Design a protein with these regions (language model features):
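Short secondary-structure junctions
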Residues: 35-41, 58-67, 145-152, 183-195
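Surface polyanion/phosphate-binding segment centered on an Asp-His-Pro turn
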Residues: 191, 195-213
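Structured beta-strand-rich core segments of catalytic domains in phosphoester-bond hydrolases
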Residues: 18-91
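Conserved beta strand-loop-helix elements of the APE1-like EEP
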Residues: 46-61, 79, 83, 165-184, ...
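A short catalytic or substrate-binding loop motif that flags glycine-/basic-rich loops and adjacent residues
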Residues: 44-47, 67-71, 166-170, 197-201
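Short, solvent-exposed loop/turn segments at secondary-structure junctions
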Residues: 19-21, 45-46, 59, 89-92, ...
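Active-site beta-strand/loop signature of hydrolases that rely on acidic residues for catalysis
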Residues: 4-23, 84, 105-126, 149, ...
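Metal-dependent phosphoesterases centered on the DNase I-like endonuclease/exonuclease/phosphatase
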Residues: 29, 33-35, 97-179
Length: 213
């Protein structure tokens, strides 16, 4: 719960690898006590991982049947003037299906945000080698309608958000925003303390977006 307490000043939270068991019920209740009264989850089965979106302001949550068996991996949260895609990507080549969906979905509208465990990055920039599956699909998304908010602010700076058992670091957690939203990106950064303390196996990522301009 300490991690949740540390991010309670946020307006919206996206929690991936969310599994609706007894622990999840405690998490959701704690979030509500912190003011995150509006919640949407993509899974109800206790043995399946999905996405939880929790917000202090109302939104309409949904899943898209266009994703088929992967529909639980993307929570679509429609806020007033902003559409958020909270993602928990599959492994290896299965990621391509989710990338294809997002590339198509983000052609519409100019106020889209993608975030979550994207489970891939760019070769040599977000890892020391070239082991990522579907790195070209991520690059196509970034070069197209959804630039990487972290790279927009920090350039070639290298940070890793997850480490393998072998100790290899990777940046696989991302925020991507519509090009017209780029001037409104005020901050995009990682907090590695939750990962380093083993409260989570991923670093926490934060985006500060001015939405009133």
């Amino acid at each position: 719960m300490a991690v949740l307490d540390e991010v309670q000043s946020s307006d919206v939270l996206v929690i991936t690898e969310f599994r609706p068991n007894k622990n999840a019920d405690v998490i959701c209740a704690h979030l509500e006590a912190l003011g995150f009264s509006y919640q949407f989850r993509t899974v109800e089965e206790p043995k399946k991982n999905g996405v939880l979106v929790a917000s202090k302001t109302p939104f309409e949550g949904s899943m898209d049947e266009a994703l088929g068996d992967h529909s639980h991996r993307v929570a679509v949260a429609q806020f007033q003037g902003l559409k958020l895609f909270g993602c928990y990507f599959p492994q290896q080549k299965e990621k391509q299906k989710v990338f294809d969906y997002l590339i198509d979905a983000c052609r519409e509208g100019d106020s889209n945000v993608i975030t979550g465990d994207i489970n891939t990055g760019l070769h040599y920039a977000d890892e020391t080698g070239a082991s990522f599956y579907c790195a070209d699909a991520l690059k196509a998304l970034n070069d197209g309608d959804m630039p990487d908010a972290y790279r927009h602010l920090h350039g070639d700076k290298r940070e890793f958000t997850w480490f393998s058992n072998a100790g290899n670091g990777f940046r696989i957690d991302h925020f991507m925003v519509s090009r017209l939203l780029l001037p409104r990106v005020e901050a995009c950064h990682y907090d590695h303390a939750p990962r380093e303390s083993k409260a989570s196996d991923h670093s926490v990522m934060t985006l500060e977006l001015e939405v009133s301009k």
